[in-house]
Amino acid sequence: MANNDPAAKQYAEWTGRACRADGIRYEIRTIDDPIHVELALQQANDDPKVHGIIVYYPIFGQDKESYSGTSQDDYIRDTVSFQCDVEGLCHLYRSNLYRNVRYLDPPHNHIKCILPCTALSVVKLLEACPNVYHSQAIMATNRQQASPVGLSLKNDTHVTIINRSEIVGRPLAAMLANDGATVYSIDLHSIYKFVNGTLQTCTETVEECVLKVRNSFLMHYYYIVRTDAVLILTKRIAA
């Protein structure tokens, strides 16, 4: 913990409560000066008594807008060893997520990659919604097998995600794009578009991204709202 953000402190308290309920030893290490966070993480990575690390963000915040991310917080995420990263935010896990790789040890496939929990929970909620995912794709997901890019969601699924944080918006966009949705990733300064997992130039406005509706179709809307992200999924069904 290297900030005074009330939401981060509350999240840390909830994390501790959940860990204690499951019999997991939980310790908060407070860093007074953010400049010492990297050293503290390196020490935790090397500590044999530490099996998992959670960093409570924001620490430095975003420097400038870039889809790849350019903030010091991004650097801090990559300082956490993948062997201790329980949030799936380090470079290795992010890279595997964007390439739709589910295991750390292919082709043996014994060690599963860790996915960001909030983004994954949204996907699981959508799997439970009718007429969104192919049933065989859900079965493959439950077995931790990655379906081919673009073949999990049913045709003509459009998703608009208002938020592009490294914790929620960005990984969620990648997951749903890999599953076959046309995804519009909206942040304060830009809009990105994914088609079948491929990043493309977006010419639509925010309003057009949210209102991707054709008059000849009946739309089902699923709204999943958090304080830091809004996902709007539209599923086109013939009238």
Give the location of each predicted region.
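Generic secondary-structure signature for well-ordered alpha-helical cores
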Residues: R20, I24, D46-K49, D78-D85, ...
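Glycine/small-residue-rich loop that forms an oxyanion/phosphate-binding "nest" at active or ligand-binding sites
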Residues: Q62-H108, K112-P116
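Short, well-structured alpha-helical segments in soluble
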Residues: H36-P48
